Swiss-Prot record:
One of its GO terms (biological process) is system development. InterPro entries: Dev_Signal_Hedgehog-like, Hedgehog, Hedgehog_Hint, Hint_dom_C, Hint_dom_N, Hint_dom_sf, Intein_N. Coiled coil: none annotated. Belongs to the hedgehog family. Gene3D superfamilies: Hedgehog/Intein (Hint) domain (2.170.16.10). The record marks C342, F343 as: Cleavage. Intercellular signal essential for a variety of patterning events during development. Keywords: Autocatalytic cleavage, Cell membrane, Developmental protein, Hydrolase, Membrane, Protease, Secreted, Signal. This is Warthog protein 8. It comes from Caenorhabditis elegans.
Length: 550
């Protein structure tokens, strides 16, 4: 009996030491899924969290295990010291550590004031996963960023967010849900949230975002807000948040550096970018297929106040050449088919570091400008729903009060509203079918003088035109700015995650069939093509009707 009591007592206080844990003084900021399907959790200590007022790190309780000779987590190589600070400072949180569950006991961490502090070790990539949730009160003021779908060989990265070289926020992993697709392949849906996070010794209140973050910290600390000291400054070019296909190298930890300037790029799973040196040291990262040309780990970096971002170098693939049809030939299309065509060839988009491009010049891998929430960001083109330079189609052309025009097909979805309606956040809007928009309503467009803001532009006239060339790009956000107008990538169906997942698998299947029967290599420039109308009809049968706009 005494022996059983002893065993029971030991079991009641025993805590497993295996699995990846960020502990209570670091923050989960990245999640990599190895080719084997096992997750790797990345933990970081930014300037706003995990510090003692005297300037040294709080005790690090992060722990990681090795499974099949691969580590299941890592600590980002952050600075060991910072400047001392006062506990009543308005630029840093009074509470500098989270409170974590004693073990891996949660199926998800879906409370607003939680993040995923640890992941239970997996001996089998197909087993259910348990998480250790950590609670941190300031997260109640956090905002939702997006949900990233991460599969084997992919990684999602958050981290510091910058505006004009001043840090104002940090993107973290709030929740992870493991799922399996119809092919039996495991993927993870990763929730990314953002909370105010300043470098207390390099915080310029003249910048809107820094001023707003300081007031958020003041609110959390129970202090009064401050008034802004100066008007807004100009917006600098953003630094991308890309993804890396890599795995944990034997005997090393993976350290992925991620700095996001301006309002940040939407993290993507398949667009690979060259790593760049940030204010933290990089160590040990080796992509699965070798490092990008010219990549050198940065072992000596300047302090955060000397941060100088490098230029974004996306990997761009060459576009597929589409042969022209013989003169007078009109390809067969089902009734109503051309209504799904989307944009004409002469529609224009802003591409990061490449300027303005016509739609017929756009390539998969280009990062195009988009309005997101209350701000402007960039989002990569993932694939083409349709791309046919020779196809003639009927478009709806809107003549606008600023003297410009905006053209797209009848069933394409676009964001419009009554001009008198007060809209503060574009994420609160639902897109409308082009054919249902009337004269006198307003579109949303990026301000010419300040692209980080949006304004309304009224429709003065509507007419029908015929043009040659139809283009339907799909971005990671599901929308983009076309002729500076905020518009969806979709036709009819207003559900980006479902539609994107559906067509992504269709494109993958099409490429496999092409390779099998015609020995054509798969490529991301390919498009769904003439099967799009049929596929949309199938999608309408399996998607709830309230998600479809008519």
């Amino acid at each position: 009996m005494n022996y059983l009591l002893l065993v029971s007592g030991l079991l009641s206080v025993w805590q497993p030491v295996f699995g990846s844990r960020c502990g209570e003084s670091t923050i989960p900021f990245s999640l990599e899924i190895l080719p084997s399907g096992h997750p790797v959790l990345g933990c970081a200590r930014p300037t706003c969290f995990g510090w003692h007022p005297k300037g040294y790190q709080l005790p690090t309780t992060a722990k990681f295990s090795r499974l099949n000779r691969k580590l299941d987590g890592f600590l980002r190589d952050d600075s060991l010291f910072t400047y001392p600070f006062e506990t009543d400072s308005s630029k840093i949180y009074k509470v500098q550590n989270s409170t974590c569950e004693p073990g891996f006991q949660s199926s998800k961490c879906d409370s607003k004031d939680q993040w995923v502090g640890g992941i239970e070790p997996e001996t089998d990539a197909f087993q259910d996963v348990a998480y250790q949730c950590c609670t941190y009160a300031p997260l109640r003021e956090s905002t939702d960023r997006n949900i990233a779908t991460v599969s084997a060989g992919e990684i999602v990265i958050g981290g510091e967010v910058y505006q004009n070289e001043s840090q104002y926020a940090f993107d973290y992993i709030s929740n992870i849900e493991k799922s399996m697709d119809e092919n039996g392949e495991v993927y993870y849906e990763v929730n990314i949230r953002r909370f105010a996070c300043l470098d207390p010794h390099n915080a310029d209140r003249r910048i809107d975002e820094v001023w707003s973050s300081e007031n958020t910290i003041r609110k959390v600390n129970g202090q009064k807000p401050i008034a802004q000291q100066a008007p807004n400054v100009a917006v600098n070019a953003p630094i991308e948040a890309g993804t890396f296909d890599g795995e944990v190298v034997d005997g090393q930890t993976v350290v992925i550096e991620e700095i996001i300037a301006q309002q940040g790029f939407i993290v993507e799973n398949e667009t690979t970018v060259a790593p760049f040196a940030g204010p933290f040291q990089a160590q040990g990262f080796q992509p699965r297929f070798g490092a990008p040309q010219g990549f050198q780990p940065a072992f000596q970096q300047p302090p955060p106040q000397q941060f100088f971002p490098q230029n974004f170098q996306p990997v761009v693939q060459q576009p597929v050449q589409f042969p022209a049809q013989p003169v007078g030939y009109a390809p067969y299309a089902p009734a109503g088919w051309q209504l799904h065509y989307c944009f004409p060839a002469d529609a224009e988009v802003n591409v990061y570091e490449k300027g303005v491009k016509r739609m017929d010049e756009l390539e998969v891998g280009d990062w195009v400008q988009a309005l997101h929430g209350k701000e402007t960001t960039y989002s990569p083109v993932k694939y083409w729903l349709h791309r046919d330079p020779e196809q003639e189609a009927e478009f709806v052309e809107f003549l606008l009060e600023n003297g410009e025009s905006f053209t797209l097909t009848e069933k394409h979805l676009v964001f419009a509203t009554d001009c008198q309606q007060n809209v503060k956040n574009l994420d609160d809007l639902n897109p409308t079918s082009t054919g249902k928009i009337n004269i006198g309503e307003c579109f949303f467009m990026a301000q010419p003088e300040n692209a980080s803001k949006f304004q309304k532009v009224q429709i003065l006239d509507i007419q029908r035109v015929r043009k040659t060339g139809i283009y339907a790009p799909m971005t990671s956000l599901g929308h983009l700015l076309v002729n500076q107008i905020h518009t969806s990538c979709h036709s009819e169906i207003d559900h980006h995650l479902l539609q994107n997942s559906f067509f992504k698998h269709v494109l993958k299947l099409k490429n496999r069939i092409s390779k099998y029967f015609w020995n054509e290599e798969s490529n991301t420039e390919g498009n769904i093509g003439t099967s799009l109308n049929f596929l949309i009809e199938i999608f309408e049968l399996i998607v709830p009707s309230k998600m479809i706009s008519y």
